[in-house]
């Protein structure tokens, strides 16, 4: 098969990030320089982000049988690259105090970003699996990067063992689907899995196993047990990547699979997804109430957020595609910027070897009296995650509720409202502790000029975006409406 210039342009983000991986590798081999490698990484990711403009000019197409580049894949590629950029900028000050090799961190982030970009345009079960593995394997190394701390190493081992088990479930599920349908591409699966076939035991078993594998990666109940431990043990910049890029990329590919394959029409599959969604919303929110560690709290809250999103998957079948797709785009954009801001503040407050990460809620007590702007940012992020009006998080929640109502999913909509009410409590708990009187004994190691560091700039931009798009969301909604998949 000959590749035309148009197809090369359509693959630009993948090619640029892949090239950056090679350049950073050679640069590490030539001379270890933390600053140079961090700069190369950021330049490469920015070029990949800019290249999306040219990708948009060539129009939607199937580049290879494995990849379909369209507005949908461009939107999620953009989100993944933004998350990777933020991770790299948060990691720089964190790594400055790190005694061992620092440069490999950026290499792992780039490889994981490559997996995320592949997932955003995956159109075939092979590229789905390749993308998920490319995304997960570097995460083992990233989670255990501060391996001299017992917690980080333990988190890495937990994630690795469970992830391997989940991947094997996923592969076996794919094998069963292939055995029954004889096709691995999403569109081919959609054509061969006609309504009569969905009820065959092999197909249902295959779908069930794929739900287990993907549910683990998205940390949905009951496959969520690793989430709080890993979020807590991983370095703060890595938790950022785990909460944003990996979840967004995998959710994007699951959504695409559901659009093409009518497995969605099966009542059994929808029932299972509805139960998982309600369980995730309630479990995530209820468990977060008692947490005193902010990373664990954000870990549990991410379980709940993916529960809200799962409702869009259930609504895909009952409804035309436009509203669920818009909902997912708006919600994930809001979730991305809110999480980047929240984890960014945690990263700015933590440094690897000056005592433990500032993760306990106690270390945020009275932060307002020392760092008023930083605590204002944290407040905005918490309100956005809770879905308070005038923030981007509210627009996302509003779309979810509107979609649930229009698809007549009353139970699920009720669960969203209930979950948001519970969520309000623990998000406000974090916010209130920022404004209490500060304890005497606490030493803070945030740099006094944090707003001038790269990480500080990312956090401030996230806060501004969350507020501006929360008040006037039209630009984002227009962008999401343009990001339609090629059917």
UniProtKB/Swiss-Prot annotation:
Q: Which InterPro entries match?
A: NADH-Q_OxRdtase_suN/2, ND/Mrp_TM
Q: Does the keyword NAD apply?
A: yes
Query: A GO CC term?
Result: plasma membrane
* Major localization class: membrane
The UniProt record lists the keyword rRNA-binding: no
Q: List the subcellular locations.
A: Cell inner membrane
Which EC class, in a word?
translocase
- How is this protein situated with respect to the membrane? Multi-pass membrane protein
UniProt catalytic activity: a quinone + NADH + 5 H(+)(in) = a quinol + NAD(+) + 4 H(+)(out)
The UniProt keywords, alphabetically, are:
Cell inner membrane, Cell membrane, Membrane, NAD, Quinone, Translocase, Transmembrane, Transmembrane helix, Transport, Ubiquinone
Q: Which family does it belong to?
A: Belongs to the complex I subunit 2 family.
What does this gene product do? Answer: NDH-1 shuttles electrons from NADH, via FMN and iron-sulfur (Fe-S) centers, to quinones in the respiratory chain. The immediate electron acceptor for the enzyme in this species is believed to be ubiquinone. Couples the redox reaction to proton translocation (for every two electrons transferred, four hydrogen ions are translocated across the cytoplasmic membrane), and thus conserves the redox energy in a proton gradient.
Q: Which proteins does it associate with, and in what oligomeric form?
A: NDH-1 is composed of 13 different subunits. Subunits NuoA, H, J, K, L, M, N constitute the membrane sector of the complex.
Q: Which PANTHER family match?
A: NADH DEHYDROGENASE (PTHR22773)
The name on file for this protein is: NADH-quinone oxidoreductase subunit N
